[in-house]
């Protein structure tokens, strides 16, 4: 049995978003073929993602300087706990699906907050004298990224958000990557052929993901 984490970052309702619509079709087909797998769904706009703020940094600095964790305030402790829950959730899974859309040639801020959360030290990586090192077990992990670019900036965005997420996931130990890029997220402003081509590829990926 595999554990799949399905992460969306799109403020639109599903019927107004190509990425959410196609992503859900992928998920339905995946579950039809893999009913025994466990799926966890995370909506970065709906679910309150803890950002790495000054309270969080203060806790890290104090722990690094040798201070007792018991002196951390309840508010600081709650923030750290929320970050660790997200990182542990990521660590426990072995398949990841990210459904995102473009905002100013990159991701919405909520997605970067999530990447910061899963990248905190201890659950997913640790610092060594030479560099940071992934702490995920050696088993095969794979990811699928469904991303809607702005139609007039399609080429440039392939080099920004998609490459960034691939680099982060590779560092964390995810070695198998797939990406399906859409030219725009608006269902009413797309050619039927381009949409069906993306849909066909996602359904094909669901058979072997």
Mark where each language-model region is.
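N-terminal beta1-alpha1-beta2 submodule of the flavodoxin-like/Rossmannoid cofactor-binding fold
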Residues: 1-100, 105-113, 200-209
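Residues at the starts of beta-strands that form the adenosine-phosphate
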Residues: 3, 38, 141-142, 176
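Cofactor-binding loop segments of dinucleotide-utilizing enzymes, especially the Rossmann-like FAD-
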Residues: 9, 148, 182
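Short histidine/acidic/glycine/proline-rich micro-motifs that form metal-
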Residues: 11-14, 150-153, 186-188
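Hydrophobic/aromatic-lined pockets within catalytic cores
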Residues: 27, 31, 119, 123, ...
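Glycine-rich phosphate/pyrophosphate-binding loop and the adjoining helix
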Residues: 28, 155-209
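A short, structured loop/turn motif at beta-sheet edges
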Residues: 31-34, 137-141, 172-173
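Helix-loop-strand module that forms the ligand-binding subsite of alpha/beta enzymes
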Residues: 75-163
């Amino acid at each position: 049995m595999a554990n799949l984490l399905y992460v969306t970052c799109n403020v639109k309702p599903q019927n107004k978003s190509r990425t959410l619509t196609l992503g859900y079709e992928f998920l339905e087909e995946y579950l039809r073929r893999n009913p025994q797998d466990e799926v966890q769904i995370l909506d970065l706009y709906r679910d309150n993602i803890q950002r790495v703020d000054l309270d969080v940094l203060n806790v890290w600095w104090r722990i690094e300087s040798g201070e007792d964790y018991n002196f951390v305030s309840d508010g600081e402790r709650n923030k750290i706990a929320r970050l660790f829950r997200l990182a542990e959730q990521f660590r426990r899974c072995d398949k990841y699906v990210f459904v995102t859309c473009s905002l100013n040639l990159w991701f919405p801020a909520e997605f970067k907050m999530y990447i910061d959360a899963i990248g905190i030290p201890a659950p997913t990586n640790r610092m060594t004298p030479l560099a940071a090192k992934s702490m995920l077990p050696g088993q095969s992990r794979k990811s699928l990224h469904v991303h809607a670019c702005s139609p007039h900036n399609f080429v440039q965005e392939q080099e920004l958000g998609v490459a960034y997420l691939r680099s982060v996931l590779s560092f964390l130990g995810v070695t198998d990557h797939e990406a399906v890029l859409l030219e725009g997220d608006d269902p009413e402003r797309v050619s039927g052929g381009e949409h069906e081509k993306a849909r066909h590829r996602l359904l094909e990926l669901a058979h072997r993901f």
